[in-house]
Every structure is written in C-alpha cells, then in structure tokens.
C-alpha cells in the first residue's frame, strides 16, 4: 500500500439515510435522489452507499475544519432541496430505531454484493451510518504510532457521537448499538497495534494471499491509513446536527496534529494495552457520555466528560492555530446536550414509551408486546430529521 504523506489537511465523509415523511421508515430511493442531484447540481460529490436507503456526502481536501464543514453544509443543503422535490426526508443517526433490517434493499454495486455473499446475516444488518474524518500525516513512518495514540481517545470520540440507542423498536440499553453491529464484520473493528509500517504491509500481504482483500476491497478497521496520505477515523456514529460533526472533526484534527508534533519532537506517544482499548470501546458504546474510561497503562479511570473537558483545554491553542477553536469549543456544548442517544430516548419517553433496556416498547394503545415499530420511537426519528434540517444553516 502506498502512503504518499501530506500536510495536516482534512477531509470529511458523512452518511445519511432517506425516510418516508409519513411512515418515517427507511426508503430505498438513493438512486432516484442522486439522479436528480446529477440534474440539478452537476458535479456534486454525494455518492451511493452500501444500502439503497443511504447517501454519503464527501468533501474535497481542505486546510481547516471550517472550510470542510462549509463543503459538507453546501452538500447537505443540496440534498435537502432534492429530497424535498422527490418527497423524502433526510435522517442522520447511527441506526434507525424501528426499521426492520430484513426489509432493506442493497445497492447493486458488485463489490457490495460480494461483501453480502461473504458476510450473509451480519452483513445484511449493516443498516448503519457514520462519520469518517481524514487527517493528513507527513510520512508512513508516523502512521501507526499516531493511530495507536488516537486509539487512546476512542471512547472520547464515540461517546460524543453515540446516536444509536434503539434497534427494531427495542431500547438496547446502549448509547451506540451501531458500534456493536459493525464489529461483527470480519474486516472491521479495532486495528491491531502494529509497531511499524513494515508490519502493516506484511499484514496486508497476508490478507491479499488469503483472499480477504479480494472479497472486501480493503480492511475496514475503525482507524486505518488511507491511500490519500491520511489517517482515517471511521468509528463515529452519524449525528443529527452539522455542528456536532464539526465539533467531533475538530477534536480529531487537533488530536492527530498534536500527536504528529509529539512524534516530530522525539517524544513517546501514548498507547493503551489492546484489552484496555477494547474495554473503552465497549464502555463508550454502552454508556456514552456517562462512561468511566481507562486513561493510561496504569489503569487509571476517569469520567469521559472530565477527560473531554481536559483535552479541549489542552488542544485549544493548537485549535486556534488550525483555525477550528470555535468548533473544538462546541465539544463542551455537545457534552451539555447529553448526547444524541439521550435526546432520542427522551423524545421516545415523552411520546409514552416504557423504556426498559432489553424490553420492547408498546406502540398504539392495545398493541401487543413485541410490536417492532412503536409510536414512541417515531418521535425520536421526527426529532432527528427536524434537527438535521433546522441546524443545516447554523
């Protein structure tokens, strides 16, 4: 794998879904929407995705977060315009809270069909949406020390973005059920702690010889190097507001640059034992912003919100230099909201759900237990779609 290296530029990818305005369920109309986008906004950068209910906004390379977010905003406004014209709504979260995954249609792209053929049941359940953040790194020798350092902040980023508490009408008890779903795929999940670029290349040769890459196109680790000379962070849930995307992206931009400068200064970069990384991932997926996380190799524990506040302060001078101080400060605003997963639960609760983790909620009065599209979770979908639209210009 070539890694050309680059300046600390940024690029963002944001997956969103299409829903019916009446049923609020997912609809497989991405092809129709993109055909209209081609007609109305020729040259747009919105792309097809794994499922026929999904589109992805992809920015060009930018020097700072505000420029990248404005690029996303332009695409979001174009999508909202075309979605209105064909009569669908946009929805942005880690998962849809009540849809039946078995009813969803896949895109007809050959590589996607091959993935489904290989992964079967679990692959068909990938009704999930995320945010991917690319940050440029100067050389391949720096990549894995920086990735291993970024993994110490896995729970920080996941807790901020967590927005998938429900699945098929079930309150899972998790802040990010998307995280638990995605790791079922054989090439997804926490990357191995490679000590060098040579180890990474040896690993890829093994995957190529064994046919793994032939089936999947690439490894889908939660964080990975990309052919563009960037580190790609892939594990954040999609959020309901663009300012949240900006806050999470600013945090990651600052973090990668912070660790690259440590490397350049000859300082030892932080890392955690693989088992601590896995535990932190689970804790953030389960508890979101209420997670108690492991912060060092001595197994010190702190609340993730306390750690986020500490790191916002630590990164603020760098954020000012990188032009994203306001976006980084919005991490504190995000903490105050309680997280998208909590807002979805609150909306469902206000609509009358009996939200006991692991117990299916009721729909209309008299509906039997186990009804998979409860009226209560419709309120969470309405909140998410409304917030996405209302904050698109913020």
Swiss-Prot record:
One of its GO terms (biological process) is modified amino acid biosynthetic process. It holds the Pfam family GCS2. Gene3D superfamilies: 3.30.590.20. Its EC number is 6.3.2.2. GO terms for molecular function: ATP binding; glutamate-cysteine ligase activity. It catalyses: L-cysteine + L-glutamate + ATP = gamma-L-glutamyl-L-cysteine + ADP + phosphate + H(+). Keywords: ATP-binding, Ligase, Nucleotide-binding. It is an enzyme of class 6 (ligase). NCBIfam families: gshA_cyan_rel, PRK13517.1-2, PRK13517.1-4. Belongs to the glutamate--cysteine ligase type 2 family. YbdK subfamily. HAMAP family: Glu_cys_ligase_2. ATP-dependent carboxylate-amine ligase which exhibits weak glutamate--cysteine ligase activity. This is Putative glutamate--cysteine ligase 2.
């Amino acid at each position: 794998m070539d890694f050309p290296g680059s300046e600390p530029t940024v690029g963002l990818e944001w997956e969103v879904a299409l829903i019916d305005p009446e049923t609020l369920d997912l609809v497989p109309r991405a092809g129709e929407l993109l055909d209209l986008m081609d007609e109305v906004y020729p040259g747009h950068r919105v792309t097809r995705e794994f499922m026929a209910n999904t589109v992805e906004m992809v920015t060009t390379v930018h020097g700072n977060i505000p420029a990248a977010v404005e690029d996303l905003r332009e695409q979001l406004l174009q999508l909202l315009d075309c979605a209105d014209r064909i009569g669908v709504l946009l929805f942005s979260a880690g998962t849809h809270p009540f849809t039946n995954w078995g009813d969803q249609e896949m895109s007809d792209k050959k590589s996607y069909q091959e993935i489904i053929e290989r992964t079967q049941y679990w692959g068909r359940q990938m009704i999930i949406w995320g945010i991917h953040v690319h940050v440029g790194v100067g050389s391949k020798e720096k990549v894995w020390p920086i990735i291993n350092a970024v993994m110490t902040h896995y729970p920080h980023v996941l807790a901020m973005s967590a927005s998938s508490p429900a699945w098929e009408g079930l309150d899972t008890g998790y802040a990010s059920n998307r995280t638990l779903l995605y790791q079922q795929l054989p090439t997804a999940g926490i990357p191995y702690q490679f000590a060098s670029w040579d180890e990474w290349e040896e690993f890829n040769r093994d995957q190529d010889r064994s046919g793994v890459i032939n089936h999947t196109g690439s490894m889908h680790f939660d964080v990975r190097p990309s052919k563009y000379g960037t580190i790609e962070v892939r594990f954040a849930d999609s959020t309901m507001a663009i300012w949240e995307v900006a806050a999470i992206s600013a945090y990651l931009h600052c973090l990668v640059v912070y660790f690259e400068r440590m490397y350049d200064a000859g300082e030892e970069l932080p890392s955690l034992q693989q088992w601590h990384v896995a535990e932190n991932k689970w804790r953030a997926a389960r508890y979101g912003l209420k997670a108690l996380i492991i912060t060092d190799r001595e197994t010190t524990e702190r609340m993730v919100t306390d750690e986020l506040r500490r790191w916002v302060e630590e990164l603020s001078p760098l954020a000012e230099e990188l032009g994203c101080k306001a976006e980084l400060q919005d991490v504190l605003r995000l903490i105050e909201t309680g997280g998208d997963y909590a807002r979805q639960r609150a909306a469902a609760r206000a609509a009358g759900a009996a939200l006991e983790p692991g117990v299916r909620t009721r729909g209309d009065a008299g509906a039997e237990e186990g009804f998979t599209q409860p009226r209560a979770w419709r309120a969470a979908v309405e909140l998410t779609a409304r917030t996405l639209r209302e904050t698109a210009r913020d």
